[in-house]
A protein has these predicted regions:
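Alpha-helical and His/Cys-centered functional microenvironments
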Residues: 11, 16, 126-128
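HIT superfamily nucleotide-processing domains
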Residues: 30-171
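Basic polycationic patches enriched in arginine
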Residues: 8-9, 20, 25-29, 33
Length: 171
């Protein structure tokens, strides 16, 4: 059996199940960084979990079903991502689109990466219907104040995403 101390030197604590987390110097040694969500996204959204391509958030306003997918990257623009990461996040976007259409009955899904107000790369995946609060206008800048999701509504949506999109909890 290999002692934990030896394993600890060769494997970052982010993937170890035992031992203390790596400090700042340890993360730098392994080129690891702590994921930090932009404050505006923290204010506007409920965290749901993690997909292969990044963190999944839910916009607080129930007027439309609006997901925000945030890749764990320093890149500012979608097309600046390495090909593998771009493919991963696009696959997540497609899975969310299929979920919105098939499980939530939205006839249209808007997909966008704008980033003018929030510089952290994030993608908007929004379920749309002619009956929604902004139709046919885009949701950006046109969304009226609306009620926030309740905890039971968030948990129901989270469970559906676990089943249909392989949503994972965030560590």
């Amino acid at each position: 059996m290999v002692p934990a101390k030896i394993i600890r030197r060769s494997i970052p604590s982010a993937i170890l199940s035992v031992g203390r987390p790596l400090g700042k110097r340890g993360r730098a040694r392994y080129n690891l960084r702590v994921f930090t969500l932009h404050p505006q996204l923290q204010t506007d959204c409920h965290p749901l979990g993690k997909l292969t391509g990044g963190r999944l958030l839910l916009h607080r306003n129930t007027a439309v079903t609006w997901f925000i997918l945030v890749p764990e990257t320093k890149a500012a623009d979608l097309l600046d991502l390495p090909e593998a990461q771009l493919n991963s996040i696009m696959a997540d976007g497609r899975a969310l689109s299929v979920f919105l259409k098939n499980e939530r009955n939205f006839p249209k899904v808007n997909f966008g990466a704008i980033g003018n107000l929030v510089p952290q790369l994030h993608l908007h995946i929004v379920g749309r219907t002619p009956e929604d609060a902004c139709w046919p206008q885009p949701v950006w800048g046109n969304l009226p104040e609306g009620p926030a999701y309740t905890e039971p509504e968030i948990e129901t949506l989270r469970n559906q995403l676990i089943e249909h999109c392989d949503l994972q909890p965030v560590d």
